[in-house]
Curated annotation (Swiss-Prot):
GO terms for biological process, alphabetical: anterograde axonal transport; anterograde synaptic vesicle transport; neuron projection development; platelet dense granule organization; regulation of signal transduction; regulation of synaptic vesicle exocytosis
Organism ancestry: Eukaryota, Metazoa, Chordata, Craniata, Vertebrata
Superkingdom, natural source: Eukaryota
Gene name as annotated: dtnbp1a
Database matches in Pfam families: Dysbindin (PF04440)
Protein topology in the membrane: Peripheral membrane protein
Quaternary structure annotation from Swiss-Prot or TrEMBL: Component of the biogenesis of lysosome-related organelles complex 1 (BLOC-1).
Name by which UniProt lists this protein: Dysbindin-A
Cellular compartment(s): Cytoplasm; Cytoplasmic vesicle membrane; Cytoplasmic vesicle, Secretory vesicle, Synaptic vesicle membrane; Endosome membrane
Ranges for region Disordered: 263-362
Family as reported in the entry's similarity comment: Belongs to the dysbindin family.
Entry function: Component of the BLOC-1 complex, a complex that is required for normal biogenesis of lysosome-related organelles (LRO), such as platelet dense granules and melanosomes. Plays a role in intracellular vesicle trafficking. Plays a role in synaptic vesicle trafficking and in neurotransmitter release. May be required for normal dopamine homeostasis in the cerebral cortex, hippocampus, and hypothalamus. Plays a role in the regulation of cell surface exposure of DRD2. Contributes to the regulation of dopamine signaling. May play a role in actin cytoskeleton reorganization and neurite outgrowth.
GO CC terms in record: axon cytoplasm; BLOC-1 complex; endoplasmic reticulum; endosome membrane; melanosome membrane; neuron projection; nucleus; plasma membrane
Composition-biased stretches (Low complexity): 271-282, 298-314
Keywords on record: Coiled coil, Cytoplasm, Cytoplasmic vesicle, Endoplasmic reticulum, Endosome, Membrane, Nucleus, Synapse
């Protein structure tokens, strides 16, 4: 459109220049004709002046209009140039916009591809996050297992240490206990030997007195022998024993009356059992009527003494518990049970054998 306008302006300018040329040519021709007419006819100066002034006025008006048209043409040309530059810029923008509009489908396809890739990346990121969480869990489990193994190792070492200490302490305690047991057994053996010796001597004295006089005399208290304090207490308890029948008191009276009758029948000079005038109420004497009854009474007395000795050797606790009550002596009619606490000891067997030999000696 602007090119057409420019072409029109150029054609107008050419037409204007051609018109001016034609006018100049016509004026030249008119001058030539005037000269010819001047020659032919007489000049008319007033008409020429009028024409000249008129042509001069028209040429001035034309020249002024030409200048004005030239200025307007230059102004229009500048504006046309500016419009051309502006529209060239707009045309470039439009072309760029057209190219961009043509690239919109490609952009949309690329955008869809990027969106799908972003979705895949999001899924990959989620999977990676889950893997990282699982890895953290595995690391925590490994750390826990490592700490657990370390604690188990420390516990095993502590158990081994304490087991060794326990074994060493147990060995020391076992050795100390064995030493104490040996010492206690040795002391018990010594004490049993001393008691056996003491009771054997006391029994031998009682047997000698009984065999020589025919009476068994029990006093309130005897003099202590040596430094055997524990045995003195036991002997004092034995000496303070009262002849009491557990089952029936009448059996003892019957036994004493029968023994008195038989002793009076066999030895009338000796007399029945009675208290001596100088003896205390606690001194009890029994007279043997015959040799067979004497042996029978000796065996029963030896068995009761053996039971008493075994009862006194059972321990200091039983001695203290029995010291509060009055000691009891079983009658000859009851069955005598031997103490099983000292049956395994050779000293008790030797004591029984010595008692049997003493009872069979008369």
């Amino acid at each position: 459109m602007f090119e057409n306008f420019r072409e029109k302006l150029q054609t107008v300018q050419q037409d204007f220049t051609s018109g001016i040329k034609t006018l100049s040519d016509k004026s030249k021709e008119a001058k030539v004709k005037k000269k010819q007419r001047r020659d032919e006819y007489l000049p008319q100066y007033s008409a020429g002046v009028e024409l000249l002034s008129r042509y001069e006025d028209t040429w001035v008006a034309l020249h002024k209009r030409a200048k004005e048209s030239a200025k307007s043409g230059e102004t229009v040309d500048g504006e046309v140039v500016m419009l051309c530059a502006h529209w060239e810029k707009r045309r470039g923008a439009v072309l760029e916009l057209q190219e961009q509009l043509q690239q919109i489908p490609t952009f949309l396809s690329d955008l869809e591809t990027i969106t799908s890739r972003i979705a895949h990346l999001e899924a990959d990121f989620e999977e990676m996050e889950s893997r990282l969480v699982y890895l953290e869990d595995l690391c925590a489990q490994c750390e826990h297992q490592r700490f657990k193994q370390f604690q188990i190792l420390q516990l095993e070492n502590y158990k081994k240490k304490k087991r060794k200490e326990l074994e060493s302490c147990k060995a020391e305690l076992d050795a100390e206990h064995a030493q104490k047991v040996l010492e206690m057994e040795h002391a018990q053996q010594v004490k049993l030997k001393e008691r056996r010796k003491y009771f054997e001597e006391a029994f031998q004295q009682d047997m000698e007195q009984y065999l020589s006089t025919g009476y068994l005399q029990i006093t309130d208290r005897r003099d202590p022998l040596g430094s055997m304090s524990s045995m003195e207490v036991n002997v004092d308890l034995l000496e303070q024993m009262d002849l009491t029948d557990v089952s029936d008191h009448e059996a003892l009276d019957v036994f004493l009356s029968s023994v008195g009758e038989e002793s009076s029948a066999v030895s009338p000079d000796a007399g029945g059992p009675s208290l001596e005038p100088g003896s205390s109420p606690s001194d009890i004497s029994l007279k043997v009527p015959s040799q067979s009854e004497l042996r029978h009474n000796i065996s029963s007395i030896s068995s009761s003494c053996t039971d008493t000795v075994s009862g006194t050797t059972e321990g200091p606790d039983e001695e203290e518990s029995s010291s509060g009550d009055s000691p009891l002596v079983q009658s000859d009619e009851e069955e005598v049970h031997a103490d099983t606490a000292l049956m395994g000891l050779p000293e008790t067997e030797a004591l029984k054998s010595s008692d049997d030999s003493d009872t069979q000696a008369p």
